[in-house]
Amino acid sequence: MKILQVDQPQSIDFDTDVLGCIAGPNCDFSWILDIRDQCIKKKILFRFLSTGPALIKDGKIYSIPKNQQVSQARKAQIDYSPNEDLFCRLSHSQFRSSFYLRPKDRTYIQQKGWETIDEHAHDFIAARLGPAIPYHDGKQTPMKGHPVFLAQHATGTCCRNCLYKWHQIPKEKDLTDKEQDYICQVIMDWLFRQMSK
């Protein structure tokens, strides 16, 4: 995951699977929308995380108090997910849709920050799902203890059988870096959705 502070028009010329966007001081909203459009073209998960203290929209400058910058970004409703079909299918599973973040999980995410949570996801996936035949496959992901574990169960990324069933990722072969990035993108997408509720 990359967190990008936008203080001028820019192109996405870096490799990432998840982009969190924060408006810098005096950012023009059209710059945020342009970055979102680039994410859509590249199928990069995009989240508008914060407006910043002043946002320019249609030539007007809006001063936004610090305690409202996150909620105003959510209110813009410009987030993009390349995983909509997957989340629609997951919503029909009683088991998958029974997972949600508890207050302590939300607090943990807020304290650690999105980049750290993404690092944890990559570490867990590499260690627990990366090998062709993971140790204790089917039981390697705890049901609690970390927000990423909850997200794995909610998204069918908890074991190699579920990866095959929900994501058509073949079993009994090492996961490629691209597959691991995709899995982490799905996990982060679920966490973003939960934190927005």
Please place each PLM-identified region on the residue numbering:
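Core of compact, soluble alpha-helical bundle domains
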Residues: 80-125
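Local cysteine-cluster metal-coordination motifs and their immediate loop/turn environment
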Residues: 153-165
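Auxiliary Fe-S-binding modules of radical SAM enzymes
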Residues: 6-16, 20-79
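Glycine-rich active-site/cofactor-binding loop and its immediate structural neighborhood
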Residues: 160, 167-174
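Short Fe-S-cluster ligation motifs
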Residues: 182-197
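Conserved SAM/AdoMet-binding glycine-rich loop
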Residues: 1-3
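Immediate flanking context of iron-sulfur cluster ligation sites
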Residues: 135-155
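Short, surface-exposed acidic
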Residues: 133-135, 171-178
